[in-house]
A protein has these predicted regions:
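N-terminal mature-domain "stem" immediately C-terminal to a signal peptide or N-terminal signal-anchor/transmembrane
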Residues: 11-64
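Bacterial Sec-dependent N-terminal signal peptides
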Residues: 1-14
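Short, flexible active-site-proximal loops enriched in glycine and acidic residues
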Residues: 106-110, 122-131
Length: 337
């Protein structure tokens, strides 16, 4: 005989995290799960709180940085024939050390995802600026869990981005000549870093007009408006001098206290375009007539421009979808976004 009932205690209301689930989560939230990290996650609680506890602990950890190691590798005195571009190898080696052995795994994972959105490259103009490129990645690591508006400002004014997308040294127009503000950063900031080319629904799907065509987010007039915002910014004064101008400021090649390769670009008012600037128009935009008024300071123009971009309804779905693709799944559903 015997009973056919299930018997025994009922299953726990909140079961523990399964080992396979822990590995899957850590393979997305770090640079690879191990037996020890999976066990530590499982030991934090059941499947309702262990993940949040792990994430909270990761957020509290300080960033593992790159540039201190690159600075330490700079020789003193500098030998004949020293190639400063070789320090890019130090940055890469330190990056691998941080992501494979660093304690701040989630921060490094998110910073890596951000580096695939907010892109600079050591190839070309940045090849001989290894401290700027290392510090740029450090900016992403420090801001990995912060506000995207704050990060956009740091990225915009970072010399690595300034050199890479030619905002550094961008000059105002000169009447009677062909000299006009460089549009490179204005275009890429919108197209790649914030809103994309077409209007989106909150789930990341493309909005359509009455004819079924996608709706562009901006046009050439808006590109030119933002290009005028991004004029007048260049290297900060070298730490070895007390005053400098747009024309004579220069990059400091060697690391030193307060050196300008890792300081935000400085505004030189004499080269900032002070006229009106057309910006993005959308429901909820606060600038009258989608225009930055004439006569403002360069700092105020920059703040208004970044607010105008950051508050655009595309930013959430556009950036979120990219981060989901880098961190979780390459083809997220609209419901996921």
């Amino acid at each position: 005989g015997g009973s056919s009932g299930s018997g025994g205690a009922p299953p726990p209301t909140n079961p523990p995290v399964l080992k396979a689930e822990a590995f899957r989560f850590l393979n997305q939230a770090s640079f690879g799960a191990t037996e020890s990290t999976a066990s530590a996650l499982i030991g934090l609680g059941d499947n309702t709180n262990s993940y949040s506890r792990w994430i909270d602990a990761e957020i509290a950890k300080p960033a593992s940085l790159l540039n201190p190691a690159v600075e330490a590798a700079f020789p003193n005195p500098v030998p004949n024939g020293f190639n400063i571009a070789s320090l890019n190898n130090v940055r890469v080696e330190k990056w691998f050390e941080n992501v494979l052995r660093g304690n701040d795994q989630l921060r490094q994972r998110v910073a890596f995802a951000l580096s695939q959105v907010l892109v600079v490259s050591q190839v070309g103009a940045l090849q001989n600026l290894p401290f700027a490129t290392a510090d740029f990645q450090d900016v992403l690591a420090r801001n990995a869990f912060g506000n995207y508006r704050d990060l956009l400002r740091e990225v915009t004014l970072h010399p690595a981005m300034g050199v890479y997308l030619s905002m550094l040294g961008n000059q105002k127009a000169v009447a009677g000549t062909n000299l006009r503000p460089d549009e490179n950063y204005a275009r890429e900031l919108m197209q790649l870093f914030s809103i994309g080319l077409v209007e989106l629904n909150l789930d990341g799907t493309v909005k359509k007009d009455a004819t079924g065509a996608p709706i562009p987010t901006y046009n050439q007039d808006i590109i030119e408006g933002f290009a005028r915002v991004f004029t007048g910014w260049k290297w900060d004064c070298p730490s070895t001098v007390t005053t400098c101008t747009f024309a004579n400021t220069r990059v400091q090649v060697a690391p030193a206290s307060g050196y300008n390769q890792v300081k935000p670009m400085r505004l030189y008012a004499e080269q900032h375009e002070t006229g009106t600037k057309r910006v993005l128009s959308y429901t909820g935009a606060t600038l009258a007539n989608a225009t930055i008024p004439a006569g403002q300071s360069g700092d105020k123009d920059l703040a208004d421009a970044l607010d105008n971009i950051f508050n655009h309804p595309n930013v959430g779905p556009f950036v979120a979808k990219q981060l989901i693709q880098k961190l979780v799944t390459s083809n997220p559903s609209p419901a996921y976004v």
